[in-house]
């Protein structure tokens, strides 16, 4: 059988080539792939939140609470560990979400928008303003002993919903605005993680910290000894999670720490992969007809696949593997478990009304004011410069989009409020403000943004990320 491919034709079957070509192009643009997944995830999050709200306010509302409080546990001899299904989602599955967040932060610091000070200045200023102003506004409106603990709720931006809104605006949104929003959200997440670790954790138990340190050191040691199998890291990662939990710190912090220490450098690199793959494939090409056995072919393909695997950093590989599961599995389940707020016809009491109003105001008013004001101040003081293709119109849309604070805001609300009525009020404020912010962002985007790009603007998100024009 001839192995010669006519000029201009693919060696792959026609029916397989087109989708594989699209897949390879998408895989070759990691940031665009990330934003595609986030946009689709935002739609799924909206559906999950709507289902939760309808379920919690339907004739079957009791089944909603009963379902999420279903006890789950393990028993080994005299040892019993039992928690509710809601706890499994919020403290267990969300640790994987925070693990991916930790890796994304590390990647951005290593090679993304946060890798250079002059590139990171604008999103850092925007994120800082977008955290401080909402928190300050919340405390201004809800500075009582019962309500002030919720100051951290309106601080974070939900990247999935925010990217989904920008996607609905289509070609009006310049790629540089998407990249700036992503960098802002990454710093927002980092700020929220610090807030959770410092302000929303109970008293620290030293024994638990020692167990957590043992797990983290185990992960680090395995990395240093070159352990490649992802499955091998499950045991030390679980030890770290259990230690952080028993220490009185929220266990999702363990996911963040392990994500931050996941290597972002490749073992082989692009050049090494090209050299290795070319060498292996040349051996096949030089074989005489009948000399190439299926065993030799499979061994060659195995080595090429190993080279492909080693050409990707562990962080990049894990993000590519876990991000779809987090975006389309864990986050919608979290929304389903936490967005079911009973809406009563009875008026809220004073404390609940204060929490709902302060939370909604912090997100809907404080976020845009903080983001836009901090950007203006940083530009005025020449601490940062705008990316090519962006102006104040785009920053107005950025600020309004940043007011969508769904996943992280609901998560912090779970930690901030111990009283059921205050937790429900906080969630109600988050849902109302996020919905209103989404509408405002869409209206402003349609009004302020045009389909014609500014001179010098990047044409894709990866080109915008690579640009050093900041």
Curated annotation (Swiss-Prot):
Entry similarity comment: Belongs to the NhaA Na(+)/H(+) (TC 2.A.33) antiporter family.
Keyword Membrane: yes
Swiss-Prot/TrEMBL keywords: Antiport, Cell inner membrane, Cell membrane, Ion transport, Membrane, Sodium, Sodium transport, Transmembrane, Transmembrane helix, Transport
Species whose genome carries this gene: Myxococcus xanthus (strain DK1622)
HAMAP family documented for this protein: NhaA
Membrane spanning residue stretches: 34-54, 85-105, 121-141, 150-170, 179-199, 202-222, 241-261, 317-337, 357-377, 395-415, 423-443
MF annotations from Gene Ontology: sodium:proton antiporter activity
Lipid bilayer topology: Multi-pass membrane protein
Summary of the function given for this chain in its UniProt record: Na(+)/H(+) antiporter that extrudes sodium in exchange for external protons.
CC per GO annotation: plasma membrane
Gene3D superfamilies recorded: Na+/H+ antiporter like domain
Annotated protein name in UniProt: Na(+)/H(+) antiporter NhaA 2
One GO term (biological process): regulation of pH
Keyword Transport applies: yes
């Amino acid at each position: 059988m001839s192995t010669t491919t006519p000029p201009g034709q693919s060696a792959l079957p026609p029916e397989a080539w087109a989708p594989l070509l699209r897949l390879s192009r998408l895989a070759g643009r990691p940031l665009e792939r990330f934003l595609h997944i986030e946009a689709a995830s935002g739609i799924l999050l909206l559906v999950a939140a709507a289902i939760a709200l309808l379920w919690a306010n339907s004739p079957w509302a009791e089944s909603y609470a009963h379902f999420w409080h279903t006890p789950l546990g393990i028993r080994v001899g005299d040892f019993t560990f039992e928690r509710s299904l809601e706890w499994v989602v919020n403290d267990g599955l969300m640790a994987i979400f925070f693990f991916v967040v930790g890796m994304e932060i590390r990647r951005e610091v290593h090679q993304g928008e946060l890798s250079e000070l002059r590139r990171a200045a604008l999103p850092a200023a925007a994120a800082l303003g977008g955290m401080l102003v909402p928190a300050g506004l919340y405390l201004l409106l809800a500075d009582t002993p019962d309500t002030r603990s919720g100051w951290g709720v309106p601080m974070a931006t939900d990247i999935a919903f925010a990217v989904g809104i920008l996607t609905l605006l289509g070609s009006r949104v310049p790629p540089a605005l998407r990249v700036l929003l992503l960098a802002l959200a990454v710093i927002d997440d980092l700020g929220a993680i610090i807030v959770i670790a410092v302000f929303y954790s109970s008293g620290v138990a030293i024994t638990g910290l020692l167990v957590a340190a043992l797990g983290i050191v185990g992960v680090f040691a395995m990395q240093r000894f070159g352990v490649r199998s992802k499955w091998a890291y499950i045991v030390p990662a679980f030890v770290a999670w259990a230690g952080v939990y028993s220490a009185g710190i929220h266990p999702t912090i363990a996911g963040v720490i392990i994500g931050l220490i996941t290597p972002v450098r490749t073992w082989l690199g692009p050049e090494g992969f090209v050299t290795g793959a070319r060498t292996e494939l040349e051996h096949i090409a030089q074989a005489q007809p009948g000399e190439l056995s299926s065993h030799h072919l499979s061994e060659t393909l195995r080595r090429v696949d190993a080279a492909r695997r080693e050409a990707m950093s562990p962080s990049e590989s894990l993000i590519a593997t876990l991000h779809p599961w987090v975006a389309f599995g864990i986050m919608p389940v979290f929304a389903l478990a936490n967005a079911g707020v009973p809406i009563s016809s009875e008026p809220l009491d004073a404390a609940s009304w204060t929490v709902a109003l302060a939370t909604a105001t912090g997100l809907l008013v404080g976020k845009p004011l903080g983001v836009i004001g901090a950007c203006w101040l940083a530009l005025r003081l020449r601490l940062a410069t705008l990316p090519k293709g962006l102006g104040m119109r785009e920053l107005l849309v950025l600020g309004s989009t940043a007011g969508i604070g769904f996943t992280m805001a609901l998560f912090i609300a779970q930690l901030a409020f111990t009283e059921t009525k205050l937790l429900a009020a906080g969630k109600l404020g988050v849902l109302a403000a996020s919905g209103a912010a989404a509408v405002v962002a869409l209206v402003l985007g349609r009004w302020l943004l045009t389909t014609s790009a500014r001179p010098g603007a990047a044409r894709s998100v990866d080109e915008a990320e690579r640009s050093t024009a900041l």
